[in-house]
């Protein structure tokens, strides 16, 4: 698993919180102090908490669990998509649709519609559709793909969710709380850690910091998958030897 160091966190600006006037007192225990009216996050707390989050992800995935990556703010979108894809995990990078988890049956129907429209589009020219009709079909598919493309291969509700910016993803946390799905989240000094099982106190605005978190969690996923594979191979070899 990638060992993130204190130096890497400092270089990525993980320690820079929000302006002191916007702080959430519930984050006081993770704040080292303030500089130029900006809160400084205590990285001596962040680093071990991030490692705990990585270990939790590794264990969960080693047991065949699924982690949903969520980050829909502008500076997180591309990174969330890239790292979740690298790890082979589902993601939401465009917009959190209300009921994405609590009304999952309806979401599954929308995913089915996306699959049907995609299949129809592939054969549209042969089926005699006009250029205008094909263009409309493309727009429909692109719209659905933007919202649902990252979760279209998800087999059911995720076992955990990894979130960038709990303030931005309030709707996500409401749904995870209702369903009892554990949350791993980056929580900045202006947000509340309530409802988050694995809190990662730190900067949730810097693309460098977001990349560091996402890469670390994706690496933990890949290590968990590798462990699961090794255990499967060992079990098969043991069975063959009997």
Swiss-Prot record:
- What Pfam families is this protein classified in? Ribosomal_S2
Record keyword Transmembrane helix present: no
GO MF term list:
structural constituent of ribosome
Q: Domain of life here?
A: Bacteria
InterPro entries recorded = Ribosomal_uS2, Ribosomal_uS2_bac/mit/plastid, Ribosomal_uS2_CS, Ribosomal_uS2_flav_dom_sf
Single GO cellular component term:
cytosolic small ribosomal subunit
* Gene Ontology terms describing biological process: translation
Q: Repeat among the record's keywords?
A: no
Q: Which keywords appear in this protein's UniProt record, sorted alphabetically?
A: Ribonucleoprotein, Ribosomal protein
> Family per UniProt?
Belongs to the universal ribosomal protein uS2 family.
What is this protein identified as? Small ribosomal subunit protein uS2
